[in-house]
Amino acid sequence: MVTGTRPLKSHRRARRGRAAGRLTTTTLATLFMIAFGVYFLLPLVWLVFSATKTNTDLSSSYGLWFAPTFALGANAHDVFTRDDSLFAQWFVNTVLYAGTVAIVSTFLAMLIGYALAKYRFRGREVIFAAILGSIMVPGTALVLPLFLLLSKAHLVNTYWGVILPQLVNPFGVYLMRVYSSQAVPDDLLAAARVDGAGELRAFWSIAARLLTPGFVTVFLFGFVGTWNNYFLPLVVLSDPKLYPLTLGLASWQTKIGLGGEMTYTVIITGALIALIPLVVAFLLLQRYWRSGLLLGSMTG
């Protein structure tokens, strides 16, 4: 009897040990994610609280809580009225840059990625390898040749000087090829061709609908990347009326260093306002980009 119960007790101890190990791993992973969440959210929380303060309260009050004077409305009014409402012009410019680049580059990425995934032709892998290689090239290495090309084309200090260099997104092409290979079944396309549908009709009627989550994911990457782009406008633009928000807020910050009338609360509030469209876009489109990233991670 004693001999028969020993294996059972050992089995129970082993199960408890495995359960304790899983619990420890889950707890550590949860704590790790909480720590990273706090790390990433802390600057945003500070930004929200700081945008509600006066310039005096900004340095005299606790950073992660409200000050006695709630000045968010006054700060926002100051942001939009300073320098003849130049911030509003920067906001419109940024929407124009980010919207145009995101829509066009994502559409091109969808077409190219779909073609690389669903068609067999000579040089396909070479083209895809070149696209992957271009992802590895740092943007700073292309600044001088890009500036010279834009200068020759008389596109420096124009809207097109910011938009054109960003219309092709190699990373977006990569994502759309990976997504197309899994989201669009070959049998479905073959059935459409048997029914008499041409390649364009098969793409628009079938593939484009199935690629919507991937399209939204790449769109968000392009939109956020262009919205936050600072270096390219810095090189291409010199007219403040053409600045995006990133370059405009940086120019205001420079005025503080030069002893101007600019205050930190204006820049902080402007940065908070600049974040709102990004947050809204992610919240409205989260249903699509979550599924797009999920399938991309499974196929990658």
Task: Tell me the role of every PLM-derived stretch.
Residues T26-G300:
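A structural signal for multi-pass alpha-helical bundles of membrane permease subunits
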Residues M1-A20:
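Short, Lys/Arg-rich, polar N-terminal cytosolic tail immediately upstream
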Residues L23:
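DHp/HisKA histidine-phosphotransfer helix
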